[in-house]
Amino acid sequence: MLSVCVVTVIGGQNPSPTPGDFGPDPTNIPVPTAATAPPAGVPMLPFRFGTRPAPPLGQKFGNVAAVAFTPEGHLLVFNRNAQIEMVEYDATGSTVLRVFNPNIAVNPHALRVDRYGNIWATDAYWNVLWKLNAKGEVLMMLGKRGENAAWSDAAWNGMFNQPLDIAFDQDDNFYVVQGHGGTSPPEDCTFCTTYPYAARADRHAVAARPPVVQGSDPRLMKFDKTGRFVASVSLAHPTGPFATTHTVVVSPTGELWVGDRNAKKLIVFDRNLKRLREIQVGYLTCALFVDAQGGLWMGAGMDGMVFKLDWNGKVLGWFGKWGSNTDSNDIGEAHQLAVSRDLKTIYVADSLNAHVLKMESN
């Protein structure tokens, strides 16, 4: 049974997926040079590619933004074809269990599942965060759809500016990172959902069009379990490239680890949002995941790699083929990833090639 659609779907043909999130950064500001990949002397992880989950209903995936596991071990896929935006598979990724919440987001970005089985999803264009129960029914929406405003540290204005990822601590506080770089939303949402919707024909018709905010106000925010805003910290760069605060996780010791993709670094905070240290990784810090044994994994975006890290940021192992692999069966963009509880299966959301990759242990 489908959950109620939140945004009206307009009929039409499903076009070919368009690569990327919001397209290239709007400036020619140089970014840090990548490290050598794979890292010298670091072993390849003992994985191979398995059979990819097939999109349902005779559709093609749009750009696949995110993957996550439910407490039962089922696979959830969040992609940018509005007709099949959320899909649930069995643990093997071979059987479709349901398709739900069509067109809940204009630009699906992150998908996380908390310990209670609630599904959290961000829409980086409409500037909202959804909390859904396991059935896909809306429990909470934070943000104002299609709106943003200048930040005030005195009080949260109730608006996000490109929310990108969510993480949870042991007390059920949750943390949101925002700020994809460029304007919010982008001047041309070509890179939004790959199925026609009402605002697509006239991008200026998206609710009350948010003001153009250069750099999109990169920020880490803390909320309590009821959704009450607690605190925030700016992650903007004083000079150099725009910050792209693309991912966040909570470590086994309760630290917050934020991936700044544009700067290719990890920034570590305590639960009070005090900055503790930075780790220059040298790879695109696109996706972070903490496995059931407390291990840290990183998807390196268009570097085409998945890394196993220690909690000092050191690379312990790698898998993939270096580069943005648009013409191969390798990883095009490791936008988000999810590791099974037994550590034997990893699913990768490839937003460039518009499919879900399955990595199986040898």
Each model region followed by its residue ranges:
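Conserved beta-strand positions in repeat-built beta-propeller and related beta-rich domains
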Residues: 77-81, 121-124, 176-180, 210-214, ...
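A short helix->beta-strand "capping" segment at the edge of beta-propeller domains
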Residues: 36-60
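A short beta-strand motif characteristic of beta-propeller blades
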Residues: 51-57, 95-101, 140, 150-156, ...
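Short loop/turn segments that connect beta-strands within beta-propeller blades
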Residues: 89-93, 133-137, 224-228, 270-274, ...
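A short loop-to-beta-strand structural motif that recurs across blades of beta-propeller domains
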Residues: 85-87, 128-130, 218-221, 265-267, ...
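Blade-level signature of beta-propeller repeat domains, shared across WD40, Kelch, NHL, RCC1
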Residues: 331-362
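Blade-loop segments of beta-propeller domains
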Residues: 84-118, 124, 323
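Beta-rich, blade/repeat-based domains predominating
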Residues: 59-72, 103-118, 147-171, 218, ...
